[in-house]
Amino acid sequence: MLWLIAAVAMALGCIGLTMGCDVWFHLMNGGAILAEGGVPHADRWLIPLPDVAPRFFPNYEWLFGVVVQTVWRWGGYAGIDLLRGVLILAAFLFVGVASWRRAGTSPLARHLAPALLLLGFAAASTRFEPRPHLVSVAGLALMTLLVRMPGLRGAVCLVPAALLWANCHIEILFGIVYALIWLVPDRSGTKLKTDDWKYHALYVIVLVTAAALSPAGSHLVGQAGSYYEGERMIRNLGFWNVELVPMTFEPYGSSRNLLILLAWAAILMRVFRKRNFIDPETLSAAAFIILPFISVRYIITSAVVLVPFLAGIPGEISPNEAEGEASPKHAVAGILGIAAVLLFAPSVFLPGHCSRPHPAGCAAPADAYDSAGEFPDAALRFLTRNGLGRRLFSHDMWGNFIAFYDNPCVHSASAPRRMPYMSAMFQTMPWQRVERYLKAVVDDGAWRRLSADAKIDTIILPYPENASDPWREFLRRIAFSSDWKLVWWDDTALVYLASTSPWLEREGRTFSAARPDRWIVTDVFPASPADRAAALAEMRRARETPEGGRVIRSLHWMASLMMQDGDATATIRLLEAVRTKTGSQERMLKAHLGEAYARLSRWPEAYDHLAVAAREPASSAVLFYNLAVAAARCEHLTEAAEALKRCLACDPSFSRALELRALLAGAGVDGF
């Protein structure tokens, strides 16, 4: 019954597809292979540079591309969703059987194993994306089962799985390492059978042979090293990349943190009990528990190894029950374990947010625009609809740079069109190319050389997150350059075209007065009323389009300009009419509304809006001061005192806040 509950919960967790942009690459790669009848090894996905020689492209994920392209032709995105679910369920079913074997005859361990399986599933759920790493996860999960039930049949089953794995993902290297660990002599006191090591050695031979026979072959290790070298170069220039962001550990509120905490405790228990110190179980757990602290992306890899390891720990803690009969207390323990996992990690068992890109090569309708999408989804759709972006420079949400490919179109009546793709594969670039792309952001001369060599005609830029963001200086360089014209912007991105672009003459759509790019890098709005009026007029025209009407950030800029002119009534009229979801911009808009109502002495409305804007993690001294004034006017003196404390914590020398604090203290308000 407990295993049935775990299986149902895992099946529910596989519902809903979050399409990563990597799917576009694998569709393209698989389509090229099927069309050409061979595996391409040319580095043709990136902007060519005349002084950088092309590099051999190992294409070690070629088979995954073929499978994804075939499935997509058969069932579209629903087929890819099904493929994703099958890989995830297969992986954790392997892990479940391995956990059952590891639990042995201990009734407590067998009843707790489903809860541990769900915990591992919940911890890994952040990586349930339709990408080749799911093949690696399924392969590694199969290995956790085979090493615990070695035999010739297992080796025979591993042969096709290894060939599939080696041609789908580079992390077959993890499988080889895992199999090698199981060659370590067992000194735990619970020795494996004498001939088990022979089968483990056979597993290593099968995996290594499969990797050597893949198109990547001997390049696999070099590819991994190239990836980390690219990461080092990025970090040195101040960028970050989610692919190598280490997991932060907090021992509460997270299924992955709980999984890691339990695994550490189990390893330490085995270490200090001495008799279980050096054995494959402990060494493999110790090796794979480190991976999430290198990159949080590896939590799914660690989960499939740690869950079977943990499944045997209850039997080791209570060795007297190892051969006992199951009792109601064991069932209660298992039910409570499952309930705890479902309670503390329920979101992973519900359909995730579906962020599916529009069918490739087809103009997206106006209602497909999603202002709240990830950078730079909407910008790419704008470029595609207008036939732009042939020579594009930008980066994606991970800090990687844009490449190109001919995108297959889901509608047979539409011809394939060239469309940008966000390349997450630094290892496919020559070192010089990576370095030139990155230096172009921080060095003006390097940027001019790169833009000339690659004939770049389009730029997509993200909004800089803070003053130290490397893109901030690049944005300043582009925003004040006569060579580039701002033609489109939304809540996540700014789009520029070269001033010589024919599209500018044909469409004539540019932003000359409404320039949020310049306002961001200078922190200065237009000085004259005439300039502010011109900027407002441009933004109003932009908001009249289906796309512009969904951009929330434009409301912020318009409200700022109106408040600078002292027009509180127009600000309220503008913002109160908003009926769309404001997402991450809600606090900012609430702050504008609160200030506007305060200027009209409508203190209750001002207090309500400012209280929302000042919720954590707000850190604006002016916002807290405005909230304190509104609270005091509404006679919420305790709230006013708290807001003043937060204000002075941000800026201890804020003179008006100090005056208000003295006034409240003189009135005998508690807290001063």
Question: PLM features: residue spans?
Answer:
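C-terminal luminal/periplasmic domains and tails of membrane-associated envelope-modifying transferases
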Residues: 349, 353-418, 426-672
